[in-house]
């Protein structure tokens, strides 16, 4: 990209409510797969489900943001505004870990975090690995309610033309590429993944199919 455009790509993190909050530096270490550190004037902190700040690294938590960059309120929606703030922190709904001082996004807490066997798994991370399979064109990973695991990992895949894939073969391929508890326990081969008007995969629709 640098050779083609003479521009440098930066992985960053932002949303409508906060503008840009986290960024890899313009000058300095840029880490692939990470969204960097809080920008000047922005406070960023991970919180656990008990509303306590997470001080350790590599422990998943919700990103919360403070600063002059944060919006004041949702227009004519006092309830949504109140639900979005805790002790002055804006709750983004996104889960991340701190990795050597840099934030790494795991996904949306509502659809991309799978709670399985006591672990919090990133569907995005599993999807990224599965996309390196030679026969897989598209993939979406979800958590499906399970009496034993809480949620079990389930993969929906669109295969490349004229390819087939059995679950036993996928499981064997995953061995050594990801921890055993991350390996999908079910495989669904579909013609296409359901998407919304923005082109994003609608994982709730996949949950309905899986059940």
Whereabouts are the PLM-identified features?
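Gly/Ser/Thr-rich phosphate-binding loop
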Residues: 1-31, 43, 50
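Solvent-exposed polar/charged
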Residues: 2-3, 37, 132, 176
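Beta-strand->loop->alpha-helix junctions that form or flank phosphate-binding loops
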Residues: 10-16, 36-38, 142-145, 188
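AMP-binding/adenylate-forming catalytic core of the ANL superfamily
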Residues: 14, 67, 72-73, 83, ...
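Conserved ATP/PPi-binding loop(s) of AMP-dependent carboxylate-activating enzymes
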Residues: 37-41, 52-84, 102, 121
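Core-facing hydrophobic residues within beta-strands of well-ordered domains
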Residues: 39-42, 136, 184
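Generic short beta-strand
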Residues: 43-44, 192
């Amino acid at each position: 990209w640098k050779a083609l455009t003479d521009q440098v790509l930066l992985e960053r993190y932002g949303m409508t409510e906060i503008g840009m909050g986290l960024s890899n530096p313009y000058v300095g270490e840029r880490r692939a797969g990470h969204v960097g550190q809080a920008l000047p004037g922005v406070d960023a902190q991970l919180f656990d489900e008990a509303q306590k700040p997470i001080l350790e690294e590599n422990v998943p938590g919700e990103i919360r943001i403070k600063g002059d960059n944060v919006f004041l309120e949702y227009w004519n929606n006092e309830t949504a505004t109140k639900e979005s703030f805790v002790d002055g922190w804006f709750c983004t709904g996104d889960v991340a870990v701190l990795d050597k001082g840099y934030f790494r996004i795991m996904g949306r807490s509502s659809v991309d975090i799978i709670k399985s066997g006591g672990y919090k798994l990133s569907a995005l991370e599993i999807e990224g690995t599965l996309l390196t399979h030679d026969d897989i064109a598209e993939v979406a990973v979800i958590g499906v309610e399970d009496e034993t695991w809480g949620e079990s990992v389930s993969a929906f895949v669109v295969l490349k033309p004229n390819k087939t894939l059995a679950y036993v073969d996928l499981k064997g391929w995953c061995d050594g590429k990801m921890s055993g508890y991350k390996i999908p326990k079910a495989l669904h081969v579909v013609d296409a993944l359901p998407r919304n008007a923005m082109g994003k995969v609608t994982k709730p629709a996949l949950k309905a199919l899986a059940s």
